[in-house]
Amino acid sequence: WIASQTHGYETVAFLSRDGYLPMKAYQIACRYCKELPQAEYLYSSRKALLPEMIVTENDLYDIPVEYHNHTPRTVLDLLSFCTKEYTDKQLKNDGFIGHKTFATRMEFNQFVRYVIEKLYDFESHKQSSDLVKRYYAEKISDKTIAFDMGYSGRIQAAISRAVGHGIDVLFVHGDSK
């Protein structure tokens, strides 16, 4: 299926982590069909692409996490690319317990508001975004098609934003979210 969809491309970028085994199978096929585009494994975790997933401060409310599995500390770890240094004492003084999981969406949203007002660092975010853009600009050209197992398409949208143009993607699974 992948081979039949890649005519005109030079590279198939298999997105980590789900793309690893399909890439290995594709590489076996490439041994027997030399005209297939080359395979490349492309690091593409949500955490690595967060600088491009978060375009405005309001996007912080929609970071790709299940809030009830996270604490202020774990959220700040994810957002370390765009937040100032903090201490547990500072969090506590401002009404948050660093290791306590969020019980409700409202509690999570209150913490995000706090991050925006007190800890968000635009300049750090810009530097991280520039780094992501440089990485993907070196890896993705208009002759590259990406392969991913699928789901929401947020990873591909972030990569497209990073490289400054839409990327073609082969999905195995789509999600309506």
Identify the meaning behind each predicted range.
Residues W1-K177:
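Long, low-complexity, Lys/Arg-enriched
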